[in-house]
Structure formats: structure tokens, C-alpha cells
Amino acid sequence: MERVAALGLDIGKKRVGVAGCDGTGLIATGLTTIIRSSFVADIPQFEAIVKERNIKILVAGLPYTMAGELGFQAQQVQKYAQKLAIALDLPLEYIDERCTSLEAEEFLKAKKQFSSWDKGAIDREAAAIILQQWLDRRRRVNTVV
């Protein structure tokens, strides 16, 4: 079985939630939240994670509108994700992330780990949900012969 080295990203205006997965590609886990300042200042933080985890692909959540269209926010996410993929020299895939932040918040509340002050926890959990969806889809595609 090939090793999976993917990084899940929940890209927002102020923060980027980051998630990684185990080498088997079964379980995604929130890793950290990067506070965005400038793109140039953000890059070294991503480079360190990519190097440490030997990342081979980026998976970014794309916030489609409820009508399934690419709105302004989705276009901004695409712009940032594409620049990031180029800067890190990694391939990039997208996952529909409608409602992942809400799902992440509900999950953290259920675990009694929710704090309205810790927005970074929601971003990390949303990134884990995004990456888990990608891992699950990848597994389904690879098992269908």
C-alpha cells in the first residue's frame, strides 16, 4: 500500500486550518492553525510542515455557495491555494467544503472541546473534515475496479 502524505487546508481570510493524515490515509487529524499576515510571511510556516511531514499533495476546501456555484469567497480561496501550491511546488486538489466549519463546531461541542474564543480549533477541525472527505473519496475510487 502506498504511503499517503496529504495536507488538508481550510483557508479563511484570517486563518488557515491545517490537517494531516496517518501514512495509511485512513485518519485525518487537525495539526495547527496558521494566522495569516501576508502571503510571503505565511510560506515559511507551510514549508516547515511540508518538510516535516514529507507532504506530496495539498487538499483545499472550496466553499461553494449553497446553489453549488463558485462565489467570491471560493475565488479568493482558489487564488490563495493556487499561489500556495506553486510556492510549495505541490499538486493541489479541491474538496467541496460547504458547511464544514459548522460541522466542525458541532463536533467540538459534542466532544465538549468547543470555545467561542478558539476559532483556530474550528479551523483545524474543518481542515481535518476536508482532508477526511478527500481520503474517503480516494479510497472509494481506488477500491472500485
Swiss-Prot record:
Uppermost EC category: hydrolase
Main location: cytoplasm
Gene Ontology MF terms in the entry: nuclease activity
Location(s) in or outside the cell: Cytoplasm
SMART domains assigned: YqgFc (SM00732)
Alphabetical list of InterPro entries matching this protein: RNaseH-like_sf (IPR012337), YqgF (IPR005227), YqgF/RNaseH-like_dom (IPR006641), YqgF/RNaseH-like_dom_sf (IPR037027)
GO annotation (BP), single: rRNA 5'-end processing
Pfam families on file: RuvX
EC number(s) per entry: 3.1.-.-
Keywords linked to the UniProt accession: Cytoplasm, Hydrolase, Nuclease, Ribosome biogenesis
Disulfide bonds: none
Record Gene3D superfamilies: YqgF/RNase H-like domain
UniProt function note: Could be a nuclease involved in processing of the 5'-end of pre-16S rRNA.
Family: Belongs to the YqgF nuclease family.
Protein name: Putative pre-16S rRNA nuclease
Annotated source species: Microcystis aeruginosa (strain NIES-843 / IAM M-2473)
